[in-house]
Amino acid sequence: MSFKSIFLTGGVVSSLGKGLTAASLALLLERQGLKVAMLKLDPYLNVDPGTMNPYEHGEVYVTDDGVETDLDLGHYHRFSSVQLSKHSTATSGQIYTRVITKERNGEFLGSTVQVIPHVTNEIINVIQACAEHHKPDVLIIEIGGTIGDIESLPFLEAVRQFRCEHPQDCLSIHMTYVPYLKSAKEIKTKPTQHSVQNLRSIGISPDVILCRSEVSLSSEVKRKISLFCNVPENAVFNAIDLENSIYEMPLLLARENIVDFLLSKFGFSPKSLDLTDWQNLVTTLCDGNRHLVRIGLVGKYLEHKDAYKSVFESLSHASIPANCSLEIVPISPESEALTNQLSQCDGCLIPGGFGTRSWEGKIAAARYCRDNNIPCFGICLGMQALVVEYARYALSLPLANSLEMDPNTPDPVVCMMQGQDTMIKGGTMRLGAYPCQITPKSLAFEAYKTDLVQERHRHRYEVNPAYVDLLQKNGLRIVGVCPQGDLCEIIEIPNHRWMLGVQFHPEFLSKLAAPHPLFVKFLSAALDYSLEKGRE
């Protein structure tokens, strides 16, 4: 086999941070001069997360080629330079759909279609297709869910078969939780032992055990895990809870020397690892002595911390070149204290979303920011809120609205895109990377320093072309358009320090080492506003 495979599974509890671990391993392996590809296998039966409620699943991350994916792919992007595509993700829904389609097309020659071998073979096909497309030295495969979940069994069986076929080219990392009982002042290894026993009963003996814990594990505890889980002591690693930032994870794993172990098992020669640049970024990010900037996030899914994951991370990245500390203030659009909360902030960000709930609150937030000259950044639905607000209160069209929110509005300044009126919801939006032509002498051009960019999209609605001339004649600047059809991509509000809306999702391109320029300029404007107000 021309590539090496690392399979990452999780046990004991969910939300262990497998995605962050996989992303961190990718960064460390890249620093060793290896080309890395990544694949996330999700056991849920949805074809993709595109129609899933953000309260259940968190945000939907979109790749350049227009695939709606799990938010873990966002971690992969932010930590490493891996190329992500439709080959970087698969769900049980996709796997079963392919198997059933093949059966309907007669490709199984009348055989009884079963989980083994037909479903497992399809999973193996996904792994091989990812490797063939990206041609990596190392392919990291994260298996979603927790060992013991019935949904994961076909994926684990496929992993077992794949490892049997390529024993010298595969490694299994099992990530577990090792609880610390404060009352007894004891670290308990039994849950890890049981999780590994469960995994071994399926036919997979882990090569590495990565123990997530609240406190550092002693050599004695590692020896105990080694003994009862049948792995060498030097294959037991500790991922202690991070103190300040998720971006400390590569530094933690580097201190554990886990990559040296993996490379030696694969027959690679480890190189000296220099993470000085990453350490400097993390140190700056965690520096609390910079001027504090408070950004109000006006969104409807605030109860789920992962619903706006990429937005949160993009703001965090931008705080480094903007040279400020950051506090993100969640503000409900339905709150009666909306304007009072915004008055305490240095900037307002209105993120993407769907549906009528909270819509009027987002428009109210946009109006308050425009009236009070507060920096404001609207993304996707947020941009549409800026346009509707401007139409209502600057153009004196009081009933102006989006057709998504009011199908009977007399002034539909936001309308459905041509060809989007479909009953099928999954995977039918305008998805993926599209070009955007930027007008010189604009806030957007000042940020990008170029007149043509590629940004990722996820939407059905657009600024109504029938109202573009009226909006522009009354001052609204359309400074970014898609050359393919002149779709409005970026708007700027006139006579304002910094008020900008984008139809795309810039948060999907930001990295710690390469913050997105629009977020940097937004935070810089918020910092200037804060300093002018004399805020501490």
Curated annotation (Swiss-Prot):
SUPFAM superfamilies: Class I glutamine amidotransferase-like, P-loop containing nucleoside triphosphate hydrolases. It catalyses: UTP + L-glutamine + ATP + H2O = CTP + L-glutamate + ADP + phosphate + 2 H(+); L-glutamine + H2O = L-glutamate + NH4(+); UTP + NH4(+) + ATP = CTP + ADP + phosphate + 2 H(+). One of its GO terms (biological process) is 'de novo' CTP biosynthetic process. Residues 294-532 form the Glutamine amidotransferase type-1 domain. Its EC number is 6.3.4.2. ATP binds at S15, L16, G17, K18, G19, L20, D72. Pathway: Pyrimidine metabolism; CTP biosynthesis via de novo pathway; CTP from UDP: step 2/2. UTP binds at S14, K188, T189, K190, P191, T192, Q193, K224. CTP binds at S14, D149, I150, E151, K188, T189, K190, P191, T192, Q193, K224. One of its GO terms (cellular component) is cytosol. Allosterically activated by GTP, when glutamine is the substrate; GTP has no effect on the reaction when ammonia is the substrate. The allosteric effector GTP functions by stabilizing the protein conformation that binds the tetrahedral intermediate(s) formed during glutamine hydrolysis. Inhibited by the product CTP, via allosteric rather than competitive inhibition. The active site is at C380 (nucleophile), H505, E507. L-glutamine binds at Y55, G353, L381, G382, M383, Q384, E404, R460. Keywords: ATP-binding, Glutamine amidotransferase, Ligase, Magnesium, Metal-binding, Nucleotide-binding, Pyrimidine biosynthesis. It comes from the Bacteria. Belongs to the CTP synthase family. PANTHER family: CTP SYNTHASE (PTHR11550), CTP SYNTHASE-RELATED (PTHR11550:SF0). Catalyzes the ATP-dependent amination of UTP to CTP with either L-glutamine or ammonia as the source of nitrogen. Regulates intracellular CTP levels through interactions with the four ribonucleotide triphosphates. CTPSs have evolved a hybrid strategy for distinguishing between UTP and CTP. The overlapping regions of the product feedback inhibitory and substrate sites recognize a common feature in both compounds, the triphosphate moiety. To differentiate isosteric substrate and product pyrimidine rings, an additional pocket far from the expected kinase/ligase catalytic site, specifically recognizes the cytosine and ribose portions of the product inhibitor. This is CTP synthase. It comes from Chlamydia muridarum (strain MoPn / Nigg).
